[in-house]
């Protein structure tokens, strides 16, 4: 029989969150993990944290999970493999159009776009005469036009 450690038994279970606030520990999550309403990860103190949240919400950098015991755990956006393309004006708008047309999550900055690395998408961006660079960076894409909790998918007007 092997000894069971405290960290293997104790898990913080979080059913609530708030937008900001002080926290005693943090958990670093990539965009995919922050997009899940349920999940589990190791916090900065090496103990597990599990979250069970309302569907349809992406956790943002700096938000705070609240455990059943009242402990507060800050969400940190983890660096991940992203592509970034720099352009101005209509060239940037054209790249944004093509990325959006493929329903990709896109982060928008001042004269740049960032998306999760994908060689096929990088080739498409190259075909527009632009040159994506590869980075390891936190990814904070825009929420979609239909992402509010009251919409479960696309809403079409008659």
Segment roles from a protein language model:
Residues 55-57, 66, 70-74:
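Short, charged beta-turn/beta-strand-edge "cap" motif at the junction between a beta-strand
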Residues 70, 78-80, 120, 137:
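Short, ordered loop/turn segments at secondary-structure junctions
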Residues 1-22, 116, 120-158:
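Helix-rich terminal scaffold detector
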Residues 2-58:
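Intrinsically disordered, low-complexity, positively charged segments
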Residues 70, 103, 129-133:
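A common structural junction motif
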Residues 49, 72-73, 113:
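Short, isolated positions in well-ordered beta-strands
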Residues 76-114:
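Mid-chain, well-packed structural core segment of small domains
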């Amino acid at each position: 029989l092997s000894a069971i450690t405290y960290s293997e038994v104790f898990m913080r279970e979080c059913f609530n969150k708030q937008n900001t606030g002080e926290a005693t520990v943090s958990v670093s999550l990539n965009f995919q993990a922050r997009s899940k309403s349920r999940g589990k990860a190791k916090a900065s103190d090496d103990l597990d944290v599990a979250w069970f949240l309302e569907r349809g919400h992406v956790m943002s950098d700096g938000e705070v999970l609240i455990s059943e015991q009242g402990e507060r755990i800050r969400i940190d956006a983890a660096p991940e493999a992203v592509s970034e393309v720099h352009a101005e004006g209509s060239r940037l708008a054209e790249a944004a159009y093509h990325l959006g047309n493929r329903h990709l999550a896109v982060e928008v900055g001042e004269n740049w776009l960032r998306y999760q690395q994908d060689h096929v998408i990088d080739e498409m961006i190259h075909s527009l005469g632009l040159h994506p660079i590869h980075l390891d960076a936190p990814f904070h894409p825009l929420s979609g036009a239909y992402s509010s909790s009251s919409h479960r998918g696309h809403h079409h007007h008659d």
